[in-house]
Amino acid sequence: VNGEDNRDGTTNNRSWNHGVEGPTDDEGIRTARRRSMRNLLGTLLLSAGVPMLRSGDEIGRSTDGNNNPYSQDNELSWLPWGRIEPWQEDLLATTRHLTMLRRALPALRRRRFFTGEPTPTGAPDVSWLRLDGEPMDDASWDDRATRSLQMLVDGEPDGSGSTLIAADTVGR
């Protein structure tokens, strides 16, 4: 499409389309794709380090499989701000909420990566917990029935309070 005859990028793309390539009218697949977008934005914006969003990720923008549309001066590369759909408005609101959480909770903006080692409080800098508050063990990580996960970040090294992030996919 961009005149590069596939010389401008890799074909080693890691994508998951929920069983259908390209656009679909299947509402179940569309719902699953939107859930994946929210989950991945949450993973990115609540993770350590500098979050790297691509222009339009906050509204689920697609370039229809073109991983390098730099030379496209058309709808493929434009951001459709004047005509976003309700699901895109919802995704944008989710992104805003996640960035607000990141700004409000210093423990999510650490200057160091987690080690799992105890901090001056005696607690590990990060703990992974089951829904019942017990530590995740190998069996919990491997259990396909596990639908909840909690991350407890000890904020002491940064002079902030601890932060608990709870992720629950039950019923979704």
State what each model feature region is.
Residues 1-172:
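Loop/helix patches that line or flank the sugar-binding groove of alpha-linked glycan CAZymes
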